[in-house]
């Protein structure tokens, strides 16, 4: 939704609200190799903004400058993705993804008080974990816990479920995607492709004109 026209100035209340929906083919956001083998991440020097500055739980385009700065820093340093810390130094999220760690078989995520986006894919992982008999624990995660975790993975609509194999040049676990990450990755793929009957209500079929399908092929 946007209030991008109608009035000049910083008060948008008299501007009309429009909704724009764009759809296009998109491959693996962090690369097919990253999705299969894991990505290399770096803890960014840019902190995630706090709730007293903006609304971190909301997906608003104006808030992405924070993430853009972290992403640019990370890519220039030779890594695939950034991990951002909250204002108190605890783990918050990736530049465009939520983050989870696995320790002793337990799935742990930062709490919403760590300025995390209330992501749809994050909620999906909660439900898929519950379906498989697991729970997701929300608690503060210290930066140092990233380095000693058995597994780390990220989630997002674009990224889907992506393993993290290195953080700040430290190998995570075995250096390969772990069993919990793989299980959730497979469940996510099954859910979004309609292969889990109980989760078909998550999907909305979209009719693609035959001409568009022919053009893609």
Regions found by a protein language model. Name each.
Residues 2-217:
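Helix-start/capping segments and mature chain N-termini
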